[in-house]
């Protein structure tokens, strides 16, 4: 195996392991975030039963659906997240070679910064093409609030993918893809671009204390998450459309979704669950730091 292939494999493994561990840890926060985002577009949650906020959601989920339901959709998320994050990190370094070849970070700061933004955005968009149906299934499973199997819309990952494919075809599994690409480019550009740039400007980037790395990563994930959050809300709402027919369809397209959310719910609706997203971002920051630590040993 060549050095480049070995390096690619190390990136893939380190990124995937770090992601699987952190996503399982923050799965309850992730589910709260998703429910707050999509409840307005859910057929299962009537207006009077909608969650009032993060605390209300955290209290009601175990009472109404059982404690383990906090991890509903987590298996799909881990399966999805392993290749997503691993491919992001692996492709990021490949794109860095393309965008940053021959660039001196100290003498050409803005070109270095722009190159990091481009490599991060391109890495996220590329990996999204491969794993979007899993991301779709994770969202629909997490949004399923039925208590028992008889009340639930889907009985698992395979059932979700099969039902939507039979109903809407491949298009149904890629509902909201275009706005996802827009959001992922903005998020990943900040996530990788600012993180790498900040670390690169330190005196000794390869020997940064883990606390410093975590603080940088925490700031980056919080900012990136808030900036791209409205795109995430719209894509989740579009995902909720798949499997619906006729009068049940809420949005005719992405633009209509943006317009109706702003008009009917107000601009604040684009940021529903955003605070839980900041908390979840601690897991994202942990991924970046853990990835760097794992790479030292593989």
UniProtKB/Swiss-Prot annotation:
Mitochondrial intermembrane membrane side: 1-7, 100-109, 200-210, 292-298
Motif Nucleotide carrier signature motif, residue range(s) on this chain: 235-240
Modifications made to the protein after synthesis: Under cell death induction, transglutaminated by TGM2. Transglutamination leads to formation of covalent cross-links between a glutamine and the epsilon-amino group of a lysine residue, forming polymers.
Quaternary structure and partners: Monomer. Found in a complex with ARL2, ARL2BP and SLC25A4/ANT1. Interacts with ARL2BP. Interacts with TIMM44; leading to inhibit the presequence translocase TIMM23, thereby promoting stabilization of PINK1.
Regulation: The matrix-open state (m-state) is inhibited by the membrane-permeable bongkrekic acid (BKA). The cytoplasmic-open state (c-state) is inhibited by the membrane-impermeable toxic inhibitor carboxyatractyloside (CATR). Proton transporter activity is inhibited by ADP:ATP antiporter activity.
Residue positions, PTM N6,N6,N6-trimethyllysine: 52
Membrane topology: Multi-pass membrane protein
Record-listed N-acetylglycine modification sites: 2
Transmembrane segment boundaries: 8-37, 75-99, 110-130, 179-199, 211-231, 274-291
Location(s) in or outside the cell: Mitochondrion inner membrane; Membrane
Modified residues (Phosphoserine): 7, 149-150
Region (Important for transport activity): 235-240
Family statement drawn from the similarity comment of this UniProt entry: Belongs to the mitochondrial carrier (TC 2.A.29) family.
Protein's UniProt name: ADP/ATP translocase 1
Source organism per UniProt: Rattus norvegicus
Record note on domains: The transmembrane helices are not perpendicular to the plane of the membrane, but cross the membrane at an angle. Odd-numbered transmembrane helices exhibit a sharp kink, due to the presence of a conserved proline residue.
Repeat positions for Solcar: 6-98, 111-201, 212-297
Residues that bear S-nitrosocysteine: 160
Coiled-coil zones: none
Binding site for ADP: 80, 92, 235
Catalytic activity as recorded in UniProt: ADP(in) + ATP(out) = ADP(out) + ATP(in); H(+)(in) = H(+)(out)
Mitochondrial matrix membrane side: 38-74, 131-178, 232-273
Gene3D superfamilies: Mitochondrial carrier domain
């Amino acid at each position: 195996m060549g050095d480049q292939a070995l390096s690619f494999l190390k990136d893939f493994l380190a990124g995937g392991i770090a992601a699987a561990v952190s996503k399982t840890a923050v799965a309850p926060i992730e589910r709260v975030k998703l429910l707050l985002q999509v409840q307005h577009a859910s057929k299962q949650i009537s207006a009077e039963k909608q969650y009032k906020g993060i605390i209300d959601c955290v209290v009601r989920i175990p009472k109404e659906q059982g404690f383990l339901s906090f991890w509903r959709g987590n298996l799909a998320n881990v399966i999805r997240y392993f290749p997503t994050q691993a491919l992001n990190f692996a492709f990021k370094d490949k794109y860095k070679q393309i965008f940053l070849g021959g660039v001196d970070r100290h003498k050409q700061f803005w070109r270095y910064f722009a190159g990091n933004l481009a490599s991060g955005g391109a890495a996220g968009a590329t990996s999204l093409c491969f794993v979007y149906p899993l991301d779709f299934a994770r969202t629909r499973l997490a949004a399923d609030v039925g208590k028992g199997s008889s009340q639930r819309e889907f009985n698992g990952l395979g059932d979700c993918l099969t039902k939507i494919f039979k109903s809407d075809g491949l298009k149904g599994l890629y509902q909201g893809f275009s706005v996802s690409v827009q959001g992922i480019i903005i998020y990943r550009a900040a996530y990788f671009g600012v993180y790498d740039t900040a670390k690169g400007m330190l005196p000794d980037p390869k020997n940064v204390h883990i606390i410093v790395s975590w603080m940088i990563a925490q700031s980056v994930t919080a900012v990136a998450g808030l900036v791209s959050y409205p795109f995430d809300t719209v894509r989740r709402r579009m995902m909720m459309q798949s499997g619906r027919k006729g009068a049940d369809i809420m949005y005719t397209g992405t633009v209509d979704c943006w317009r109706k959310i702003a008009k009917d719910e107000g601009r604040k609706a684009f940021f529903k669950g955003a605070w839980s997203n900041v908390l979840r971002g601690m897991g994202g920051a942990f991924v970046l730091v853990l990835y760097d630590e794992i790479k030292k040993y593989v």
